[in-house]
Amino acid sequence: MANFRFHQISNTQKIRHISKIFKNSSFIVFLHGFMSDLEGKKPNAFLKFAKKNKKSFLALEYSGHGKSSGKFVNGNISKWSKETSILIKKYVKKKEFILIGSSMGAWISLNQFKIFKKQIKGFLGIGAAPEFLENLMWKKFTKKMKEETIRKGIYQLKHGNYEYPITLQLIKDGRKNKVLNKKINSN
């Protein structure tokens, strides 16, 4: 089982993460999906793989996810991307790394190329969902759903047994973080 720790981002915000560091080793950085956490099979499978192959490992829970502080409704792609870059700078430092992004984590991963393009040596998207807020949600919302989101600032999207709080600020921020149909500069 993973040993979780917390990294203090600010006086009021802490991010839960797993980090396992092998001296002189490159990193595997795992980023989970929308409203997910580090309790699932994927992060633990990649941690196990990293340990077996003596690769350093980092995975984190964005604010409002899992046991990290904050409320989900206050988060967005920009905020979660920034939190990710803070932890990469803290733990990976100047070492090379491979990014693994699951669902929304792939979108957060692609945003990391803007900062770490010389350090990133590989990228794996699992069920990659960049720009899903616009393409898979907003464009598929009915007129009534859009009106409620605009009026209330939030829409409780029911999907199966789950309910997802989709805020207007989350949708708008997603539009500021477009990565599809754009060139990604990497080594």
Where are these regions (language model features)?
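N-terminal cap/lid segment of alpha/beta-hydrolase-fold proteins
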Residues: M1-K23
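Short beta-strand element of the alpha/beta-hydrolase
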Residues: S25-G33
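Short substrate-entry loop that stabilizes the transition state in hydrolases
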Residues: M35-K41
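Conserved alpha/beta-hydrolase
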Residues: P43, L47-S69
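Catalytic nucleophile-loop/oxyanion-hole region of alpha/beta-hydrolase
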Residues: G66-Y91
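Short beta-strand immediately N-terminal to the catalytic nucleophile in serine-hydrolase-like folds
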Residues: L99-G101, I126
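Gly/Ala-rich beta-loop-alpha elbow adjacent to hydrolase catalytic centers
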Residues: G101-S109
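The alpha/beta-hydrolase serine catalytic core
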Residues: W107, Q119-N187
